[in-house]
Amino acid sequence: MPGYNHVNRLVSELGEIGTKTQYLFTIGLVLTTIISIFFNIGLFRICKKNGLNIIPILILWTFSFSVLGAGIFPYPLRLHGLLGSPSIILFLSPLAALVFWKNTVIAHIKVISLLTLIIMMLGFLVFLPDFFSNYLGLKQ
């Protein structure tokens, strides 16, 4: 897409209706959904095997759902935003891991969960319009 810049433009603009990259973007999102489903299934099995609570994994399913919705309904359709929005609770997954996985056999999972939570919380900068206002893509 000519003139596109990841720093100041929305990622969804790559899949916007009528762009040359629309179908490539959609295929990428659908493939991402499929891969994330297999990833979630694997994590679910690991949790069951190690006796870990599955709530953090169930929250991860919001990502799969959101990416699929954003891919099937391209920007600027209303459903693009609506079906893409469940991923806003994705940050709850590492938070739930910190709460529910207190005693685990998986080394360093609490540290990794905390670091992941901190990084994911940076995504909420997108809701502060005056903070880095020219860098919407970077905040996203």
Where are these regions (language model features)?
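Alpha-helical transmembrane segments of multi-pass membrane proteins
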Residues: M1-N5
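Small-polar-interrupted transmembrane alpha-helices in polytopic inner-membrane proteins
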Residues: I57-G71, I118-L122
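Membrane-proximal helix-loop-helix units in multi-pass membrane proteins
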Residues: F63-V105
